[in-house]
UniProtKB/Swiss-Prot annotation:
Residue ranges, annotated region (Mn 3): 407-419
Location of the region described as Mn 2 in the Swiss-Prot/TrEMBL record: 169-183
Organism for this UniProt entry: Homo sapiens (Human)
Residues forming coiled coils: none
Protein name per its UniProtKB record: Stabilizer of axonemal microtubules 5
Region (Mn 1) residue spans: 125-137
Annotated stretches, region: Mn 4: 448-462
Cysteines joined through disulfide linkages: none
Amino acid sequence: MATGALLPCSRPCPMSRLDFLKASHFSLGPDLRLHEGTMRTTSHRDFAYPAATREPPSLQPPPALLFPMDPRWDREERVSEAHRAFPPPSTPPWELLQAQARERTLAMQAGNLHLHEDAHAGIGLSNAHAAYGWPELPARTRERIRGARLIFDRDSLPPGDRDKLRIPPTTHQALFPPHDARPQPRAPSCHLGGPNTLKWDYTRQDGTSYQRQFQALPGPPALRCKRASSGVELGDCKISYGSTCSEQKQAYRPQDLPEDRYDKAQATAHIHCVNIRPGDGLFRDRTTKAEHFYAREPEPFVLHHDQTPESHILKGNWCPGPGSLDTFMQYFYGQPPPPTQPPSRHVPHEKLQSHVTLGEPKLLKRFFKTTMGSDYCPSEWRQVQKAPNLHLQQSYLPRGTGEFDFLTMNQKMLKPHRTPPAPVTEEMLQRCKYSHMEPPLGGLRFFSTQYKDEFPFKYQGPAALRLKNPQEGFVPLGTPHQRGCREKIDPLVPQPPMYLCPSQQ
């Protein structure tokens, strides 16, 4: 600045110092200087904002066109069909807009927001605000807003009692007051059935069945830790948790309205749809149909011609008690001696059965047993009652007899130390020899071998070894003797052999 003061000014400054400072700052609102010499769109030309000046139409002669034009078209204003059909709304006079802008500027200056004035018109107004203004606020609302802004400018918190002094209402709360808090109930229309004919024995019950059955024990409330306590108290703990609300909801609540605007008793009297609460209401779920047409218990179904047994599947323990789960080894070797009787070295023959005779009829029903045979047993057969023994161990795995007839050479040589079995008598050997099963054909042996001839089914004398060719066989050639159709043959009677053995010849 000092250098500029010493040097001679080549040209005078067009603006003073204050104007220069104003021009160096930004200004709000449209700047008309920006639109000078710029191309405008069709919408800006047809729908210009109020501050803009419409350019006069050029009077230059139009260039020669292919089709001749009517000279009356140039004199008429060129507008679009939509603009001609729907003209824009009438704008307020320019003086009214300037007065509104001046009031708004004074209100903004009162809030410590100082803006430099601009020489251009329409400062602080947008195009939409200038074209489409909203309705003005009442004078009382303006004073409240202006006073609230002044208080807010001085201090963020208004002076006075903070519990009684609330935040001033907003523009929406001032312009749109709430409706009537207690509207008058309307009479029910006739086409909806008229007044409610159902009379319910409804009484208000705030507590539930769970609260009635499981009541809390009386006692002081639990003490809270100081570190866990909060400075924000959401309601009074002595009253209940019903008045719990946040600070924003408490500040921006409807003015001069009761706390409980919903009358439950009044709503219950005029309601048609009854909500049944499970377990709390007095409605016992009784209907006319349930009272008069009650469900009767059905009679038991009995089938008189049913001869089917209970089940064809054998149960696991049909005859419970000791001795019902015996194994084959325990059955043949008898029960172990009681602890009072000392064990003897030789087991008597009455308690020992070392061989299974396949042809003995007494053991037929014990070992060859089916499901049907056990379910449909004959009347003369009775189950053997076994002596109770407390030292009998339950086992489902048959272990076999373990005698020398079913042992290998290794098992015969390496025997564990146990009670030796009784010696085999001659009577037992003879009974074992003569108790084999006889085939139904008797002595007719169609496919005989050397082994079968030397060791036949029935005992035919002492066994004698013969030195013969083992490849030689005795297969009958031809067909056997054909008997008549009416001839009866007893299969149990031994038949004469077709080819006699060499010893019998």
